Amino acid sequence: DVAPSRGLGDVYKRQIRILDAELVRNGFHARKSAVGKKYIYQLDLAEKPDVFTRRYTYHFPQRLDLDAMRKAAQLLIGTYEFAGYTDKKDEKSTKRTIYAIMICGQGSKVSIQYEGTGFLYHMVRILTGTLLEVGTGARSIESVKEPLKSKDRSQAGFLAPARGLFLDEVYY
């Protein structure tokens, strides 16, 4: 018998690194059995993109009011119908719980961390685009509640590119 982490590590050694592997109960489903997830969205605000991180961050060379973004993020914490924050129209349920949104900045690097029960199609990227619009002053802090009330995607911000988004942790 080959340890699962070793066998998979041999196949994917250039793309991923396996730190641990565990046996799971019958019926386990990696996505459907999850009780929560944490995503991190990485931004680079420098005038020119960092050559070492440009493939893994969204280059957004604008001044951001991180305090305004944090205030807006607090309005999104809780259990809501997030229909206005998804691009998929036929979701069975759009009710999700966001436990935390943390926005950290150091120099020209900014990271936005999202923790919740789960996220809809494009939800984290739309939330990020909305918070960036708050940060640039293009929208008010209070406006982040409009897509929750109206369930209208057009009331939310732009779809941030996938390039800066990482699934950091899955909770079971």
Where are the language model's segments positioned?
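Single conserved hydrophobic/aromatic residue that forms the stacking wall/gate
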Residues: 1-12
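Intrinsically disordered, low-complexity sequence elements enriched in Ser/Thr/Gly/Pro
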Residues: 4, 29, 52-53, 123
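Core RNA-modification/binding signature centered on pseudouridine synthases
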Residues: 6, 26, 61-172
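Ordered, amphipathic secondary-structure segments that act as subunit-interaction surfaces
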Residues: 10-43, 47-52
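Acyl-group handling in specialized metabolite and lipid biosynthesis
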Residues: 53-60
